[in-house]
Regions:
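Conserved catalytic core of the tyrosine transesterase superfamily
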Residues: 1-270
Length: 270
């Protein structure tokens, strides 16, 4: 028996939608995130006997929106408004595409409003002393420790995102001009980020002393490597950075995004 979705079903059209996104140079990460969000809605709809996009109505989408609002995580906490919006936005894009392709007569998600939460500054912002306590965590006697110190310094100096750091190449760092080129960042756009001398010094130390020990086989130029010579997986990076935050014994928790918020805040203050 084939596991392929039934022709004309939302699941089948999702495969076509993902191919359409890829043809328009959306990043694999963005496509995966949209697939996950839309797939969750498709599974929810299937439990209610709805599998064809033509059978989805505006009231049904509003019901799914209420489902997300009342959903509780394992710890009993509700989904943040931003998380709810993140799960609904791909569904709006999916039905907009279905309407454009004339696979539905009208777009039931056209006027679906996204949840709006209060705009607040992040509660967890590190002080300079707290940052230094975290930066002192890696064991500099090991290649991985020197790599991790360079990673932490880069996050703190640039406020770049987790995936942007993972994708950095050795050729993206301009030591003379004190710049880092971020390729295919948010919106699949490139940008140039000023970088401090201290962070560049740690990156150079890692590049010269530790990275050669981590390269395995062909070197594709990825800046930060695992012990197997590969790019670091997003969840792995989150875990390592979060472990250094926890080991510092602070009252605050977080990982890469904590550094991003802290760096952005300090940039505004200075």
């Amino acid at each position: 028996m084939s596991d392929a979705p039934a022709p004309g079903s939302m699941a089948a059209e999702l495969i076509r939608f993902a191919a359409w996104l890829a043809a328009r140079n959306y990043s694999p990460y963005t496509i995966e995130q949209r697939n996950t969000a839309i797939g969750a809605f498709i599974a929810w709809a299937a439990l209610r006997g709805v599998e064809r996009p033509q059978d989805v109505t505006r009231p049904m989408l509003e019901r799914y929106q209420r489902h997300l609002f009342h959903h509780r995580k394992v710890d009993g906490a509700p989904l943040a408004f931003r998380t709810q919006a993140t799960r609904l936005t791909p569904i709006r894009a999916y039905f907009k595409w279905l309407a454009r392709e004339r696979l539905v007569l009208f777009n039931p998600a056209a006027d679906l409003e996204l949840p709006r939460g209060e705009k607040r500054l992040p509660a967890n912002i590190l002080s300079p002393d707290e940052v230094e306590a975290i930066l002192a965590g890696p064991d500099l006697a090991t290649p991985q420790g020197l790599r991790d110190r360079a990673i932490l310094e880069t996050l703190y100096a640039t406020a770049i995102r987790r995936l942007e750091l993972i994708r950095l190449s050795v050729f993206d760092v301009d030591y003379a001009r004190k710049l880092i080129v971020v390729r295919k960042g948010k919106g699949n756009k490139d940008r140039i980020v000023p970088t401090g001398a201290r962070a560049l010094g740690w990156i150079a130390a890692y590049r010269d002393e530790a990275r050669p020990q981590l390269v395995c086989g062909a070197d594709d130029g990825t800046l930060f490597l695992t012990g197997k010579g590969q790019a670091i997986a997003p969840k792995k990076l989150t875990g390592r950075v979060g472990a250094y935050v926890a080991a510092a014994g602070l009252s605050k928790t977080g990982s890469c995004h904590l550094f991003r918020h802290t760096a952005a805040t300090l940039m505004l203050e200075n």
